[in-house]
Swiss-Prot record:
<comment type="function">
    <text>Component of the large ribosomal subunit. The ribosome is a large ribonucleoprotein complex responsible for the synthesis of proteins in the cell.</text>
</comment>
<comment type="subunit">
    <text>Component of the large ribosomal subunit.</text>
</comment>
<feature type="binding site">
    <location>
        <position position="35"/>
    </location>
    <ligand>
        <name>Zn(2+)</name>
    </ligand>
</feature>
<keyword id="KW-0689">Ribosomal protein</keyword>
<dbReference type="GO" id="GO:0008270">
    <property type="term" value="F:zinc ion binding"/>
</dbReference>
<comment type="similarity">
    <text>Belongs to the eukaryotic ribosomal protein eL43 family.</text>
</comment>
<feature type="binding site">
    <location>
        <position position="50"/>
    </location>
    <ligand>
        <name>Zn(2+)</name>
    </ligand>
</feature>
<keyword id="KW-0863">Zinc-finger</keyword>
<dbReference type="GO" id="GO:0022625">
    <property type="term" value="C:cytosolic large ribosomal subunit"/>
</dbReference>
<dbReference type="GO" id="GO:0006412">
    <property type="term" value="P:translation"/>
</dbReference>
<dbReference type="InterPro" id="IPR002674">
    <property type="entry name" value="Ribosomal_eL43"/>
</dbReference>
<feature type="binding site">
    <location>
        <position position="53"/>
    </location>
    <ligand>
        <name>Zn(2+)</name>
    </ligand>
</feature>
<feature type="zinc finger region" description="C4-type">
    <location>
        <begin position="32"/>
        <end position="53"/>
    </location>
</feature>
<keyword id="KW-0479">Metal-binding</keyword>
<protein>
    <recommendedName>
        <fullName>Large ribosomal subunit protein eL43</fullName>
    </recommendedName>
</protein>
<keyword id="KW-0687">Ribonucleoprotein</keyword>
<feature type="binding site">
    <location>
        <position position="32"/>
    </location>
    <ligand>
        <name>Zn(2+)</name>
    </ligand>
</feature>
Length: 85
């Protein structure tokens, strides 16, 4: 049951399984990219705050890093490396 026990038997099992996966990722702590500590928590939709270095950043709605953001960051890093050569 876990985090979706608050819904009881309502909404169906498959929907509760999807919500469970989302809520677990939403409420978990993430590693801060600035200080490296596991203190990044979600404050609101897309707003993430580090309790250690007190930085507030914009991220994904349910996870700190979205897959598209990771793709863009790696492309930018690759282009910078090509520019430096």
């Amino acid at each position: 049951v876990g985090i979706v026990g608050k819904y009881g038997t309502r909404y169906g099992a498959s929907l509760r399984k999807m919500v469970k996966k989302i809520e677990i990722t939403q409420h978990s702590k993430y590693t801060c990219t600035f200080c490296g500590k596991t203190k990044m928590k979600r404050r609101a939709v897309g707003i993430w705050h580090c309790g250690s270095c007190m930085k507030t950043v914009a991220g994904g709605a349910w996870t700190y890093n979205t897959s598209s953001a990771v793709t863009v960051k790696s492309a930018i890093r690759r282009l910078r490396e090509m520019k430096d050569q």
